[in-house]
């Protein structure tokens, strides 16, 4: 489950038109969330609130052997008025869905975490802050460890963003660490430069897109045709086939204090929202220095079913590993879901009330008259809504499962009861 502060942070990116998917670090995010999802440890309660459109708070209390907790604050210079902040109104896919479909490069004002249908929801803020100078401040204090972490995000231009993250704790070298990120996004490609005080780390990573909506014809539509008309996706004939975007990238980093470095190469193919077939994502990453090869494949088989598989191989030791993951959504409670209920089944309609017989009532017989005619049912007036016409919840929960070759498994059920969003999980990791 994504934390509330993560949800608000992505709402800030959506409101400012920043594409967080166009980075190398998010190359394999879909398979990672479907297979390597974290399991809850102990009992943990979180209370969060978007107090104002600019300010959010979160308080967490947990018990894992000892009682601990945290206090978080977030401030956004952009008013986040378009997101659902109440836990009974937040669309569950915005917090729980693992499969992430890429959105078009030409429309940066979409929510980063969206469902498979890509329909606008309450959680999708309008892109009202496509101006320079947007900023976000975040701080979190962990108790009783007295560990403090903070983050500052500053938008200088529509294509340039700087992020500073810091952690302060006594056990760390020099009492803390500082990480700086400079992100440059030109839709066709994205470049990041990073520097950290932990080991004097310096690095650079980049991602280049081609094909699909990143092609020259889609990025520069002919005169008289706007990008919204084509949805940034080119001719409709291409959508009948497997229509997606190829991305290739690499990262290179070096530790100036320990005199060690590393690098990796990666490629991804993912279908776009305009694709009319089954959504899928395939990635391949290679670490030449360590000899590791990692391949993943994820598919959204149905609106309520996502599947993923991962294969790792080392060319030096000939060791290999594999793992699979599945995500099943349900609009029923856990009991009905485990008994094999179809998530798309609808409730049976209520039986029609029996019709009254034509026989007169006793009172009408005593007064030598017919019964009064029954009032005709009034049709609702246009524009009026009944009490049952409110927003209907599409899903009530999701079951996530993973399994690997060493018989390690994980089971996680996440859902909502009234205003409480919960996670229950178990697994074997030995």
Curated annotation (Swiss-Prot):
Free-text note regarding domains: Lacks alpha-helical transmembrane segments, suggesting that it resides in the membrane via beta-sheet conformations similar to those predicted for other outer membrane proteins and porin.
Name the gene: MDM10
Q: How does it sit in the membrane?
A: Multi-pass membrane protein
Quote the subunit structure annotation: Component of the ER-mitochondria encounter structure (ERMES) or MDM complex, composed of MMM1, MDM10, MDM12 and MDM34. Associates with the mitochondrial outer membrane sorting assembly machinery SAM(core) complex.
Segments of this protein annotated with the region Disordered: 215-237, 339-393
PANTHER family per UniProt: MITOCHONDRIAL DISTRIBUTION AND MORPHOLOGY PROTEIN 10
Question: What GO biological process terms are annotated to this protein in UniProt?
Answer: establishment of mitochondrion localization; mitochondrial genome maintenance; mitochondrial outer membrane translocase complex assembly; mitochondrion-endoplasmic reticulum membrane tethering; phospholipid transport; protein insertion into mitochondrial outer membrane
| The UniProt record lists the keyword Magnesium | no
Keyword RNA-binding belongs to the record = no
Q: Polar residues bias located where?
A: 215-234
Q: What is this protein called?
A: Mitochondrial distribution and morphology protein 10
Q: Where in the cell is it found?
A: Mitochondrion outer membrane
Q: Name one Pfam family in it.
A: MDM10
What cellular component GO annotations does this protein have?
ERMES complex; SAM complex
HAMAP family (UniProt xref) = Mdm10
Q: What does this protein do?
A: Component of the ERMES/MDM complex, which serves as a molecular tether to connect the endoplasmic reticulum and mitochondria. Components of this complex are involved in the control of mitochondrial shape and protein biogenesis and may function in phospholipid exchange. MDM10 is involved in the late assembly steps of the general translocase of the mitochondrial outer membrane (TOM complex). Functions in the TOM40-specific route of the assembly of outer membrane beta-barrel proteins, including the association of TOM40 with the receptor TOM22 and small TOM proteins.
The UniProt family comment states: Belongs to the MDM10 family.
Q: Which keywords are on file for this protein?
A: Membrane, Mitochondrion, Mitochondrion outer membrane, Transmembrane, Transmembrane beta strand
């Amino acid at each position: 489950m994504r934390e509330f502060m993560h949800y608000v942070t992505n709402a800030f990116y959506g409101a400012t038109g920043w594409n967080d998917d166009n980075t190398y670090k998010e190359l394999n995010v879909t398979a990672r969330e479907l297979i390597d999802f974290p399991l809850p440890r102990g009992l943990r309660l979180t209370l969060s609130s978007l107090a104002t459109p600019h300010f959010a708070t979160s308080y967490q209390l947990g018990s894992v052997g000892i009682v601990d907790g945290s206090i978080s604050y977030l401030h956004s210079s952009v008013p986040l008025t378009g997101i659902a902040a109440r836990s009974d109104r937040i669309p569950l896919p915005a917090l729980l869905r693992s499969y992430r479909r890429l959105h078009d490069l030409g429309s940066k004002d979409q929510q980063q975490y969206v469902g498979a249908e890509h329909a606008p929801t309450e959680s999708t803020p309008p892109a009202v802050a496509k101006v320079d100078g947007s900023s976000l401040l975040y701080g979190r204090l962990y108790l009783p460890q007295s560990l403090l972490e903070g983050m500052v995000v500053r938008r200088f231009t529509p294509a340039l963003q700087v992020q500073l993250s810091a952690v302060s704790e006594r056990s760390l070298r020099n009492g803390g660490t500082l990480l700086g990120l400079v992100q440059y996004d030109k839709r066709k490609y994205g470049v990041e430069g990073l520097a950290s005080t932990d080991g004097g780390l310096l690095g650079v990573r980049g991602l280049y897109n081609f094909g699909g909506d990143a092609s020259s014809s889609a990025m520069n539509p002919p005169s008289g045709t706007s990008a919204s008309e084509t949805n940034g996706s080119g001719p409709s004939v291409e959508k009948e086939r497997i229509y997606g975007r190829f991305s290739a990238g690499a990262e290179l980093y070096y530790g100036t204090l320990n005199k060690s470095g590393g690098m990796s190469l990666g490629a991804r193919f993912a279908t776009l929202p305009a694709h009319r077939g089954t959504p899928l994502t395939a990635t391949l990453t290679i670490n030449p220095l360590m000899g590791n090869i990692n391949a993943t494949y994820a598919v959204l088989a149905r609106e309520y079913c996502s599947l993923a598989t991962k294969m790792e191989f080392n060319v030096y030791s000939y060791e290999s590993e594999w793992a699979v993951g599945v995500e099943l959504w349900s609009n029923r409670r856990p009991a009905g879901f485990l008994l094999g209920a179809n998530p798309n089944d609808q409730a049976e309609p209520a039986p029609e009330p029996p019709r009254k017989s034509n026989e007169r009532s006793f009172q009408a017989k005593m007064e030598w008259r017919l019964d009064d005619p029954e009032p005709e049912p009034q049709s609702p007036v246009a524009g009026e809504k009944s009490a049952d016409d409110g927003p209907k919840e599409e899903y009530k929960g999701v079951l996530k499962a993973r399994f690997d070759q060493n018989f390690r498994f994980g089971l996680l059920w996440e859902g909502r009861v009234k205003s409480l969003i919960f996670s229950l999980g178990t697994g074997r990791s030995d």
